Amino acid sequence: MKVLEAGHAVVTDLGRYEGPALGFSVNGALDQESAKLANILVGNAATEPLIEITASRVKVRLDRRAVIAVTGAPVEMHVEGQPCPALTPLGLPAGAEIAITLTGPGMRSYLAVHGSVEATALLGSVAPDSMIGFGTRLVAGLELPQLVEAPDLANPHLSVSLIHLGLRGPVVPAEPVIDVTDGPDREEFGTTAEKLFGAPFTIEPRSNHVGLRLTGAPPHREKPGEVLSRGVPVGAVEVPSDDQLLVLHRGRGVTAGYPVLAVLTTGALDVMAQVRPGQRVRFRRVSVAHARDEHRRRELALAHVRERVRIALVEHGLELPSHHGTDPVTAGAGSGSVTAPVDGHRSTNDVSVDPDADAPWG
């Protein structure tokens, strides 16, 4: 695959989970659910490398036949000048030129290729880390090797072959609601802690993959004294002394020294990945149990889509490897049991979930 127009895009995956124990940020796709879905739609494991496009336009040319899919923020996608839909597997010939332009709302979209693309890895992950200057950023002329050539999915009635799954794109509200659980320092804010859930907060331009700055009327810490630097989770809502909030995202350092008022849920982190500077958000307090059940529901919905995609792709001649036991989406999802960490907690309790109910894209 050759990059013709680069925009603001990188090769990434779900993150460097071996990194935090060694002092590295986890990084990875900021909208994890959209990244997982993109890989699922092309028959990959959810953990495979893919391209994250941030608020820009990217154009690439395929070197080999491929099955691709685009998810995340709404886009205009053209293949050889012909409009094509997102949220569905597309079978394309070698030499096809793909142009993807983010139209909004939303901030990030994901391009996955069946069999993935090759990029340099560190500690088992290709995720960029700006603090150490690691990662593959797209530039015009860059060649990204396609690891697999897909079979010919030619459709005699269409110039572009697609497998229609009827998935809907995520709805990005003008003022998203961000779910949070209580942070370890909530009691230090006394009665002012409730101010977090009152008026909205505005995303500042000085926001990136490390964290987002928000202005508004934040709570004020009532306990005097400094906070010693300690480990902080992805999603921590910190309250510094300058009347702003900091929401730490996947590029955050593993330690920090501000009080942590709240922690975003897994789903809320994906929502925050799609908000733009100047946009307003509102915080909503939820229990850890609610956050855990919501995470299971979303993972089961992804597993349901994976099974539909698997059947469709196999019928079209693709040979798909088994991902069970290694893929965070399929591992345990069939039984309704999810063992991946959820908002700092780990659980194997079953939960009754309708995988088609209120999935953000299905």
Question: Predicted segment positions?
Answer:
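Conserved "landmark" site that anchors the functional core of diverse proteins
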Residues: 1-362
